[in-house]
């Protein structure tokens, strides 16, 4: 009968010997680690087991666990072992105890790793399945070495300390070999990254080429910033250009050494801590603040601080959405004047209207493109700057006169828009809304050179003439300006454009009301002037040797025009027109106050005497305040009357075209001064086809000139002539200046207001 106990023991020993021989041939052995002698002596028939390390023991235990289940089944099928086989049972007990101890150790390592990750709420270095549990995080040296594993329970046996030490040593070797899975490592170590952050910020600050960023903060004790070239974040090297000679340096030390050569020795101010030199005390003060890291200027909208006010102003623009500087020739817009000047110099463009910080247009600011001054220039009635050419500069020059008389101006109910915004600051030319008898005689200037600051102005209802700025004041403030070559005029052209723009925006109803109001005023004044004329003709002293009496109000109102003529008060009673009829009445108007006023006006402006003044060739201007005389009255004029008439007709003509003669139309004067007296007298008694003044219009209302194409009335011959000059001969709505064809009168007005013609 077969012995089942002997057969089972023999099979187990053979399998164990084969398993050990396999590991002995394939796994490298480590000397010094032997099994316990008791376990070896307890199995005399067992083959000698080679010493293994910690990893080999772990593999053995796993293999033995797999074999444990079939062995248990086999033992259940066989009878219980006899007394002779107690040694083999002790061998099984030793292996099971060793497996339990190793499992407890791995469970402790795994629990410690879980507690560490749970304490930081995230896997700092990412979870790597290739790393055994319990090993340190391979990325923890990037986040600091202060992390320590939680305390672990001390193993009970001394045999478990060696595996833990072996695992710790192997983890240090695996830190550099195990790559992270979910976290991207930094580009450089912590120390090098911190040292590179500060120079990068300084490079970005110094890369700004603006003058306002001249004194940027830098390290006080770091000489590399001033002795080495500086590169910005884009890799571009910072250059320092000399404003005097144009030499370009790449380091601050070289630039300061070169700048010293352009300074006077007695004006050099040098920094005590570095080679910085300057001629200005405030520059040295800002530089010393930089060394001391003092930044007294702070932004009220953020935490930005700086060493001077200029840098703070530049920084505040970063919080604003207003681009103050815009190019007139392209879509370029910027917040910084220095960049705007560079654009204008590079492309040869012209500047547009400068905006204030709140976004409102400011025509009084001019961009000096080639000047060294920072920011725009403010004009106070002076000549136009060299860089301020264009329509924007002319508007700003006209607007410079406005602040002198803004306080005395009443509010006018005139429709405003962008086209008429430039007229809001102008004082209005006043028209007499009351009859001449009720209106006092004002000491008005007799020439454009006379200052208009002393003229008292009374509020009146709006009229087309009230929409114009005072041309006499503008001419007096800007006598040295360049003239327009076409009409030999300067600001009259701009005034006509502005008037056309404003009148074009008035509604037809308002325009009709203004015309009816002016017509009613002129009719009332005409009736009163006729009654006064008849009364004075009867009551005044008669002298048959003199000509027709001159109206009193005519002499009172003629000086109200900005005249530049030769006033001869000795011949104030000489008639303007004479006739040979026996029934004519000749008398002298005995108004001493008016004569004294005329004499004083003539004495105050002697430089304007003897200026040739003739009517404009486009439209013959009528004598203000006179009825046209019949032609038969002029047929038999005596030679004496002809001589007196020739001497005084230019004076009457000046009342309607005085501004034209004062603005320099000498060519027209020379061409018309050779005419005889009969032609002058006939031209004074008639009007052209376009001029339609009412019959007997008094001097208070003045002559009215009408453009039949645009249905606009003018009270000044120069403005009327300028306006008619824009109408072309072949097409009345085609601009005669530039040839652009416009769509009706409104289109022509808008074209004149928006485009500069020179």
Swiss-Prot record:
In embryo, expression of maternal transcript is highest in anterior region. Zygotic transcript is expressed in anterior region until the beginning of gastrulation and in posterior region until early gastrulation. After this, it is expressed in developing nervous system. InterPro entries: Znf_C2H2_sf, Znf_C2H2_type. The modification Phosphothreonine is found at residue 178. The keyword Metal-binding applies. Residues 523-532 have a biased composition (Acidic residues). It is found in: Nucleus. Residues 398-415, 513-522, 652-695 have a biased composition (Low complexity). The modification Phosphoserine is found at residues 188, 207, 209-210, 537, 540. Residues 198-214 have a biased composition (Basic and acidic residues). PROSITE patterns: ZINC_FINGER_C2H2_1, ZINC_FINGER_C2H2_2. Keywords: Developmental protein, DNA-binding, Gap protein, Metal-binding, Nucleus, Phosphoprotein, Repeat, Zinc, Zinc-finger. The keyword Zinc applies. A zinc finger (C2H2-type) spans 240-262, 269-291, 297-319, 325-349, 705-727, 733-757. Residues 30-51, 172-214, 365-416, 513-536, 603-695 are annotated as: Disordered. GO terms for molecular function: DNA-binding transcription factor activity; DNA-binding transcription factor activity, RNA polymerase II-specific; RNA polymerase II cis-regulatory region sequence-specific DNA binding; RNA polymerase II transcription regulatory region sequence-specific DNA binding; sequence-specific DNA binding; zinc ion binding. Belongs to the hunchback C2H2-type zinc-finger protein family. This is Protein hunchback. It comes from Drosophila melanogaster. The gene is hb.
